């Protein structure tokens, strides 16, 4: 446990950010699953619409430093390849 006052404050903010990051990552995973489901159901229009949402979320995650840029690029590329199979 921290004894220094500033470290106690940092622990609070770190926990708050951790929960926000977890929530954000969960929402991204949900959209990715929806894209994969749309591809499995051969619904190209829905897949393309959800792909756009996924791209936005990955880019937002990079700008908020939730994700590394390479992680985001790799996942966007994989999703695009998946949608292109339709």
From Swiss-Prot:
Highest rank taxon of the organism: Bacteria
Keyword line: Ribonucleoprotein, Ribosomal protein, RNA-binding, rRNA-binding
Region (Disordered): 1-20
Amino acid composition bias (Basic residues), ranges on this chain: 1-11
One example of a Gene Ontology biological process annotation: translation
InterPro entries: Ribosomal_bS20, Ribosomal_bS20_sf
GO cellular component, one term: cytosol
Pfam family, one: Ribosomal_S20p
Function of the protein: Binds directly to 16S ribosomal RNA.
HAMAP family assigned: Ribosomal_bS20
NCBIfam families for this protein: S20 (TIGR00029)
Name this polypeptide is given: Small ribosomal subunit protein bS20
Organism from which the protein derives: Aster yellows witches'-broom phytoplasma (strain AYWB)
This protein's encoding gene: rpsT
């Amino acid at each position: 446990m921290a004894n220094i006052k500033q470290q106690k404050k940092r622990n609070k903010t770190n926990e708050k950010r951790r929960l926000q990051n977890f929530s954000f990552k969960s929402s991204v995973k949900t959209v990715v699953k929806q894209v994969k489901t749309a591809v499995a159901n051969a619904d190209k229009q829905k897949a393309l619409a959800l792909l756009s949402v996924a791209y936005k979320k990955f880019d937002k995650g990079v700008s908020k430093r939730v994700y590394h840029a390479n992680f985001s690029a790799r996942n966007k590329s994989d999703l695009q390849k998946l949608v292109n199979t339709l």
